[in-house]
């Protein structure tokens, strides 16, 4: 399912589904006829739980190959969502599937898992693993929500969860548990909402594109335009885009030396200089990419500037139990530059200086807009009140608290977003 970006509908998370002989009215699933397959479970990642369940039951094509080969009907049991990005969500999925291979989980779950491989694949063992994961860093520091879709599995989970809670000193501070079903609007991703979101992303990207052009023109940086000569510089109007302000209404911070507005000729692409390889040596690796994209200031996802509507309905966003290791997540690292470098107009939460194109950290809470310089956040974490004690010799922070939403987490969890 989906989790991190709840407000945008385009969410991400995990599901635990299993083959059942029960029929639930909201899913219209027929009882399975193969009794040998009862209790079979599957763990995966998806951005659309409803579509993913239909793929498991062979109602639509695409994905879920291992679970559609005459393996009966499937029901969705639980969904975990609220991850800061897809990389964190996919790491959660891999650790849930391979707890004894995960460096974070192997010691925590070794005493709860049975010795045989077949018993480790049963639903009870997977629930024990999930309970241990929710007490393990970094997932214990993330604002996750565990939604149970089936009452009988929720009752079994309650007994397992109470056993784990008795062995711990405190509950996970940010965990939320609730019950629901797939008819919840949170889990619905219809075509109309997806199309509206895509149009808005394209309009915001065009606005941001024009904003950067105007700012660079006032700063008299002709080299900036050299790398943009291959892009369509025309931004859509309000009537064409249907969302977002017109680029002409974007305010540009004044620059020193000249207060005149940029002339139309200043926005024209400058002639390029090529070396013996046919490449402009003044361009960095991002500017040399013909598919270079600009990111929206209000969106964590990048959208192409010269595309009005991007059809992402064909992107399933699902996996079927890949065998990547705990650190081998290169195919899934889709974190954009916004997670590492600040955008125009963003300021540090401590020194209140601009973080535009500077290395910064972001809040792990997906709904918080906190940004801070790495050094400023580290100093605030070491000395929360801004005053150093003569006996304070610690140089590396242990925990950090967001000054906006009060979200607390280990320093390693904060710095992981910068070092991905």
UniProtKB/Swiss-Prot annotation:
Q: EC number(s) in its UniProt entry?
A: 3.1.-.-
Parts of the chain that traverse the membrane:
none
Task: Name the domain of life this protein comes from.
Answer: Eukaryota
Low complexity: bias regions: 247-266
Q: Output one GO MF annotation.
A: zinc ion binding
Q: Where are the zinc fingers (SLX1-type)?
A: 348-405
Region Disordered, as annotated, extends over 237-306, 311-330
InterPro entries per UniProt: GIY-YIG_endonuc, GIY-YIG_endonuc_sf, Slx1, SLX1_C, SLX1_endonuclease, Znf_RING/FYVE/PHD
The answer to whether UniProt assigns keyword Transcription to this entry is no
Renumbered to this chain, the signal peptide range is none
Annotated Gene Ontology cellular components are: Slx1-Slx4 complex
Top EC group: hydrolase
* Pfam families tied to this protein: GIY-YIG, SLX1_C
Provide the primary localization: nucleus
* Keyword terms, alphabetized: DNA damage, DNA recombination, DNA repair, Endonuclease, Hydrolase, Metal-binding, Nuclease, Nucleus, Zinc, Zinc-finger
Supply the Gene3D superfamilies for this chain: GIY-YIG endonuclease, Zinc/RING finger domain, C3HC4 (zinc finger)
* Compositional bias annotation for Acidic residues: 311-327
Q: Which metal ions or organic cofactors does this protein require, according to UniProt?
A: a divalent metal cation
Where does the record say this protein resides?
A: Nucleus
Whom does it interact with, and what assembly results? Answer: Forms a heterodimer with a member of the SLX4 family.
Q: Give the record's family classification.
A: Belongs to the SLX1 family.
What's the protein name? Structure-specific endonuclease subunit SLX1 homolog
């Amino acid at each position: 399912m989906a989790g991190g970006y709840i407000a945008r509908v385009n969410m991400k998370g995990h599901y635990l589904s299993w083959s059942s002989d029960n029929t639930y009215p909201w899913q219209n699933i027929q009882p399975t006829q193969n009794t040998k397959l009862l209790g079979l479970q599957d763990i995966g990642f998806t951005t659309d739980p409803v579509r993913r369940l239909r793929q498991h039951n062979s109602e639509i094509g695409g994905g879920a190959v291992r679970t559609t080969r005459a393996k009966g009907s499937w029901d969705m049991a639980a969904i975990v969502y609220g991850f800061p990005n897809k990389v964190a969500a996919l790491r959660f999925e891999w650790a849930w599937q391979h707890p004894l291979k995960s460096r974070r989980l192997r010691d925590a779950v070794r005493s709860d898992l049975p010795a045989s491989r077949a018993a480790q694949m049963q639903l009870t063992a997977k629930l024990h693993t999930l309970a241990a994961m929710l007490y393990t860093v970094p997932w214990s520091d993330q604002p996750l929500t565990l939604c149970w879709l089936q009452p009988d599995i929720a009752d079994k989970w309650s007994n397992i969860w109470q056993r784990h809670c008795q062995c711990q000193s405190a509950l996970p501070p940010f965990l939320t548990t609730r019950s629901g079903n797939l008819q919840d609007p949170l889990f619905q991703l219809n075509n109309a909402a997806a199309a509206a979101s895509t149009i808005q992303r394209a309009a915001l990207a065009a606005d941001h594109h024009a904003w950067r052009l105007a700012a660079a023109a006032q700063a008299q940086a002709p080299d900036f335009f050299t790398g943009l000569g291959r892009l369509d510089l025309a931004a859509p109007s309000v009537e064409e885009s249907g969302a977002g302000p017109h680029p002409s209404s974007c305010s540009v911070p004044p620059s020193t030396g000249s207060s005149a507005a940029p002339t139309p000729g200043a926005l024209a692409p400058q002639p390029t200089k090529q070396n013996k390889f046919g490449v402009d040596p003044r361009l960095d690796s991002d500017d040399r990419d013909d598919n270079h994209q600009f990111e929206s200031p209000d969106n964590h996802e990048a959208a192409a500037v010269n595309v009005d509507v991007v059809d992402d309905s064909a992107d399933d966003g699902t996996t079927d139990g890949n065998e990547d290791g705990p650190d081998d997540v290169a195919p899934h690292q889709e974190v954009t530059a916004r997670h590492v470098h600040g955008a125009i107009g963003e300021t540090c939460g401590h020194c209140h200086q601009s973080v535009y194109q500077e290395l910064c950290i972001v809040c792990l809470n997906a709904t918080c807009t906190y940004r801070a310089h790495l050094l400023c956040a580290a100093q605030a974490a070491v000395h929360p009140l801004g005053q150093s004690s003569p006996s304070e010799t610690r140089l590396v922070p242990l925990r950090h608290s967001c000054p906006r939403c009060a979200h607390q987490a280990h320093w390693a969890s904060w710095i992981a977003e910068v070092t991905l």
